[in-house]
């Protein structure tokens, strides 16, 4: 059987190192830099001939540069005769551009899927895709992992009144996600229907469900400028919720997000480390991080050994 070779792109080296440590591996030698004309340079520093290669690169920070770096790393490993190349993309880039929502709009998520395939990726591992149908954009296998087991564990360990909580989706699209968590905790759920005027601007919110005298836990796959979740927190408190938490898989936190969280009435805003959060945490004491490196590491181990990955949909590996 070929050996695992694990490479890290430059988007999230801390997460890559955590995954490597859990697998008992050293990260592979790779040098990524820019040429003087700003083209991306990648040098793979060890043989990958016949090996099972995994490249960890999240869709965050300088997204376009990081995506290009990932594509070049995949292609470099492929033409160096690796037996299989798996792109491990904790936060999938362009995932919100998954449909034609207005005239002449591009479906950029499909374009990214095509680019990964053409570069030479044989398999994709990602987490909490914005729309699970994105898996259908690929002609290669895609494992869409879920942060839900780690979220359930965090709720049980950190919210003492979790049996008196209510799980709330900040929009109708997240109803499936919150009902799954509510069922697993054996609590009720609610959702907030919002009418958007334009991107990143929230107009009117309608709460469906009774949150009075309960701990409200907002759950979503991502938060960008945080306008939606901060408005939702105000709505929940005015409807009688005793406390409000927000739990998100991908904390993008761009623009005014940090100041909005600081000014909002959250007990905590909990995110996973699919995106680096160290700098954001320095400016916001409410942000807490769930480490999901063990889920990615176990997915890599199971994929390499030809085992089922679906166990991870409902369990947190030790």
Curated annotation (Swiss-Prot):
Identify the keywords attached in UniProt to this record, alphabetized.
Answer: ATP-binding, Kinase, Magnesium, Metal-binding, Nucleotide biosynthesis, Nucleotide-binding, Transferase
Question: Its Gene Ontology molecular function terms?
Answer: ADP binding; AMP binding; ATP binding; carbohydrate binding; GDP binding; identical protein binding; kinase activity; magnesium ion binding
The Swiss-Prot or TrEMBL record lists the needed cofactor(s) as: Mg(2+)
Region spans: Binding of phosphoribosylpyrophosphate: 212-227
Q: Which reaction does it catalyse?
A: D-ribose 5-phosphate + ATP = 5-phospho-alpha-D-ribose 1-diphosphate + AMP + H(+)
Report if keyword Signal is assigned: no
Query: What single Pfam family name could you report for this chain, choosing any that match?
Result: Pribosyl_synth
Which EC main class describes this enzyme? transferase
- Provide the E.C. number(s) assigned to this enzyme: 2.7.6.1
**What is one term from the GO cellular component aspect held by the record?**
protein-containing complex
Q: What is its pathway?
A: Metabolic intermediate biosynthesis; 5-phospho-alpha-D-ribose 1-diphosphate biosynthesis; 5-phospho-alpha-D-ribose 1-diphosphate from D-ribose 5-phosphate (route I): step 1/1
- Means of activity regulation: Activated by magnesium and inorganic phosphate.
For this entry, list what GO says about its biological process: 5-phosphoribose 1-diphosphate biosynthetic process; AMP biosynthetic process; animal organ regeneration; pentose-phosphate shunt; purine nucleotide biosynthetic process
Keyword Nucleotide-binding (UniProt): yes
Q: Which SUPFAM superfamilies does the record match to this protein? A: PRTase-like
Family matches, as InterPro entries: PRib_PP_synth_CS (IPR000842), Pribosyltran_N (IPR029099), PRibTrfase_dom (IPR000836), PRTase-like (IPR029057), Rib-P_diPkinase (IPR005946), Rib-P_diPkinase_bac (IPR037515)
Q: Which residues bind ATP?
A: 96-101, 130
Q: What does the subunit comment say?
A: Homodimer. The active form is probably a hexamer composed of 3 homodimers.
Q: Note the NCBIfam families from the entry.
A: PRK01259.1 (NF002320), ribP_PPkin (TIGR01251)
- What is the annotated role of this protein in its UniProt record? Catalyzes the synthesis of phosphoribosylpyrophosphate (PRPP) that is essential for nucleotide synthesis.
**Designated name of the protein:** Ribose-phosphate pyrophosphokinase 2
Q: Which gene encodes it?
A: Prps2
